[in-house]
């Protein structure tokens, strides 16, 4: 299993950065940022590992002798250690900007072993820092950056944000006279899908959503298939849509939009906006009434029901010759679009309104 890593800047993020010379070169300059210790303790408890990544201009030269750096730095480490907080690595670039080294943030030389070994849990790892270079560093790694600010996005807010994000999980149960549906969704995990609706082709289609959205789904539906497949498909869609909407929470940081065009001789188009407003448009024709034991007219009803509970705008269109390919391409393209839309890119609400409802 890959590691959930927080790559944390030191000066200005873990500890206060003095404005006189931007160096913590004596004990009297050492001051922890507010709430950093309780936040790191809480994040350690949900299996995050911590790595300090810091630029220290001219460290080891007359500009910044190591003797002045080491004493406050080691005291800082001892404070964290006394509270049960361990840093797995402390990575320091001692160079000046003009040295053009490959280890100074936002370059990624200091963490090259992590990138080479592919041991990062990319969706669940973050860079936390107070400078734009930290956010660029995150972008260069391919993970999310969180810009620390003592007022606007402090350690208390980072705690709340990462606790919400680390879960992004939902569990919905829907029991009616016609069906019993149990849906669990993990947006930050993939593989190990368990899907059983009693309709084999439908199971296959739902798995395509999970695979291409890179999420984990457990869906168990028991329905009145002795009558037909309508209630089973409809109630699964309603439950899945509600679970996806619940797992997204306040949608802070998500891409919000997604679109894609895949498969074989079929061309499927999916345009998705997790806007909080429901709108659905569907354009598809099939020559067969059924694919296996799955009614083709229920594809439209599935996505209409799903979008109503997701509170999203969804446009779907497909053309092609093979009904199996057309159906599969729609489910795959929706999964791809969903992957784009739910991917966390920053820590802001993706709307000028400041809310997505």
From Swiss-Prot:
GO molecular function annotations of the record: histidinol-phosphatase activity; imidazoleglycerol-phosphate dehydratase activity; metal ion binding
Keyword Amino-acid biosynthesis: yes
SS bonds (residue pairs): none
Residues annotated to bind Mg(2+): 9, 11, 130
Chain sites annotated for binding Zn(2+): 93, 95, 101, 103
E.C. designation(s): 3.1.3.15, 4.2.1.19
NCBIfam families, alphabetized: HAD-SF-IIIA, hisB_Nterm, Histidinol-ppas, PRK00951.2-1, PRK05446.1
Region (Histidinol-phosphatase): 1-167
Family: In the N-terminal section; belongs to the histidinol-phosphatase family.
UniProt lineage: Bacteria, Pseudomonadati, Pseudomonadota, Gammaproteobacteria, Enterobacterales
Principal subcellular localisation of the protein: cytoplasm
Matching InterPro entries: HAD-like_sf (IPR036412), HAD-SF_hydro_IIIA (IPR006549), HAD_sf (IPR023214), His_synth_bifunc_HisB (IPR020566), HisB_N (IPR005954), Histidinol-phos (IPR006543), IGPD_sf (IPR038494), ImidazoleglycerolP_deHydtase (IPR000807)
Catalytic activity: D-erythro-1-(imidazol-4-yl)glycerol 3-phosphate = 3-(imidazol-4-yl)-2-oxopropyl phosphate + H2O; L-histidinol phosphate + H2O = L-histidinol + phosphate
Native source organism of the sequence: Blochmanniella floridana
Pfam families: IGPD, PNK3P
Protein name from the UniProt record: Histidine biosynthesis bifunctional protein HisB
Cofactor(s) named in the record: Mg(2+); Zn(2+)
Keywords tagged on the record: Amino-acid biosynthesis, Cytoplasm, Histidine biosynthesis, Hydrolase, Lyase, Magnesium, Metal-binding, Multifunctional enzyme, Zinc
């Amino acid at each position: 299993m890959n590691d959930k890593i927080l790559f944390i800047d030191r000066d200005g993020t873990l500890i206060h950065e003095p404005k006189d010379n931007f160096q913590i070169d004596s004990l009297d300059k050492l001051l922890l940022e507010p709430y950093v210790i309780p936040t790191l303790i809480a994040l350690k408890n949900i299996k995050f590992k911590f790595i300090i990544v810091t630029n220290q201009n001219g460290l080891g030269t007359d500009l910044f002798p190591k003797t002045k750096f080491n004493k406050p730095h080691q005291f800082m480490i001892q404070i964290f250690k006394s509270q049960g907080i361990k840093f797995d690595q402390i990575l320091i670039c001692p160079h000046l900007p003009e040295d053009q080294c490959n280890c100074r943030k936002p370059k990624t030389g200091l963490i090259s072993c992590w990138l080479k070994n592919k041991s990062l849990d990319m969706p669940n790892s973050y860079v936390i820092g107070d400078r734009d270079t930290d956010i660029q560093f995150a972008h260069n790694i391919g993970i999310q950056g969180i810009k620390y600010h003592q007022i606007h996005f402090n350690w208390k807010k980072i705690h709340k944000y990462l606790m919400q994000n680390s879960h992004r999980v939902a569990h919905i149960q829907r029991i009616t006279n016609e069906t019993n549906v149990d849906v669990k969704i993990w947006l930050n995990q993939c593989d190990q899908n368990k899907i059983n609706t009693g309709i084999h082709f439908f199971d296959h289609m739902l798995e395509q959503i999970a695979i291409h959205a890179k999420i984990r789904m457990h869906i168990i539906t028991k329905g009145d298939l002795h009558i037909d497949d309508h209630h089973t498909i409809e109630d699964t869609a309603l439950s899945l849509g509600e679970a996806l909407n619940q797992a997204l929470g306040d949608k802070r940081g998500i891409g919000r939009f997604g679109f894609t065009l895949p498969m074989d001789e079929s061309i499927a188009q999916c345009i998705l906006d997790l806007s909080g407003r429901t709108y659905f448009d569907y354009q598809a024709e099939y020559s067969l009434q059924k694919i296996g034991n799955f009614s083709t007219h229920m594809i439209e009803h599935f996505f209409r029901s799903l979008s109503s509970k997701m509170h999203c705008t969804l446009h779907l269109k497909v053309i092609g010759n093979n009904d199996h390919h057309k159906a599969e391409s729609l489910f795959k393209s929706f999964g791809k679009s969903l992957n784009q839309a739910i991917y966390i890119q920053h820590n802001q609400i993706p709307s000028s309104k400041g809310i997505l409802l």
